[in-house]
Amino acid sequence: MKKWSILLMLTAFAVILSAAVQPVKPGEKVLFFGDSITHGGRYIAFFQLILDSRGITGTDMMNAGISGGSATGGLRRIQHDVIARKPDRVFILFGMNDVGRWRYKTDSPQNLQNRKNRLETYTASQKKIIAMLKAAGITPVLMTPTAYDQYQKDETDNLRCNEPGLSDVADIVRKLAKEENLELIELHPYMTDMLKKHPDLQLCGKDLVHPIHVGHLVMAALLAEQTGLAGPVADVTIPVSGKVQSRFAAISGLKTAPDRVQFRYEPERLAVDLSIKIYNVEIFKNLETIYPFHEKMNRETLRVTGLADGNYSVKADDKELGIFSAAQLNSGIDLGKLETPNRARSIQAMKSAWAFYNASSKPRGLVQCRLLIASGKYGTPAPGDHQAVGEALDKWLADHKPDWPYRKYYTTVVNNYKKNAPQEAAMEADLIRAGKKLQEDARPVSYTVTIEKTR
């Protein structure tokens, strides 16, 4: 924790040079503009979950990521994919595809020149993106890139040399934030530090580029921290005699005695469930080793002081949560770890966040395919003419050699377009429903707490 605090202080100094990141306001529309890391959208869904579970109501976290995207490529779609959607703020996350990681394998004169050229192109494109957003009355927010996981203990044959390129990108982003007086979100230093400290615990996949589930939750947590959302779910102290102290929860109907306390507990926030399994695998199993999520975001403390010595039954409504000593209650118990009525809601909210992620990432494949044929070389079909777009995509795919290394991937992308495009309107409706359900499920319920000495 000490090393983490030092890193936080050093990075905070860099952030001071840019504008302070403003909290997300109720009803705010925020769009995330980036590459495949954003296209997948898990960190966006997790961030939406954190906002909803903390009562920041009516927000809309929108996905404008495209697999293989770059800052230069972003310029070609910014008008229809970003500005036309009328967000209040746009969080910009490019860099991974801009540097050309194969250029870092050796320090040949040609590679050194190519690195320089690519970074200059990236800088120029980012400046144009910033200018276009400002001209449209939209606030740009810059994000340093995620880390390149060249430290993981894996025998995968992939380039393990790209971190200097991403560090250069991070420096460019910081410089632009300072020059333009823009808000800045730092991902790169924190995630790089985690990877270096825990090479045995993968934060990214075997391609060393794309964060896995736990990496996306770390991204969301860093976003939450830097937009002012860190802190407990609740922190409540109830003395048997004296004044109640409470953060993020209301206490009503309080009745106290030396061996019995009862009250109505009305929390404002909901803990984030970390127990979810995908294909029977605990996807957040190693989270606390990498990032102190519970301490920073998930603690829900209830203290009861002044009780007579002994053991006490703690109940939520009529359900017993456990037996605790007076000393334990005096120090504080963590309601977020107990089977309160909100435990089930927390589990459901994470499932709803997962549904929101699926609903928000699926339409991005349609945008991706339309961009593949945007040059007009394969015709200029209307976006809504799904059959004509599919035929143009077939021509585009046929233009690539059979041994093209990305043929299998793009064949799947094109086939998915043909399958999903006719349901585009239904997909958009599903996304709206998924967002509403997540907001509903992420709200806590109130319940009666009874603490009584056991006989």
State what each model feature region is.
Residues 1-4:
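Positively charged n-region of N-terminal signal peptides that target proteins for export
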Residues 6-7, 374:
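General helical structural elements
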Residues 7-16:
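Bacterial N-terminal signal peptides
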Residues 8, 34, 94:
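Residues that line or immediately flank small-molecule/substrate-binding pockets and catalytic motifs
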Residues 17-21:
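Boundary at the C-terminal end of the N-terminal hydrophobic targeting segment
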Residues 24-25, 45-60, 69, 73-455:
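Alpha-helical cap/lid subdomain in secreted, periplasmic
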Residues 28-42, 67-70, 99:
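Catalytic nucleophile-elbow at a beta strand-turn-alpha helix junction centered on a G-D-S/GDSL motif
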Residues 32-33, 63, 142:
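A structural signal for the hydrophobic beta-strands that form the central parallel beta-sheet
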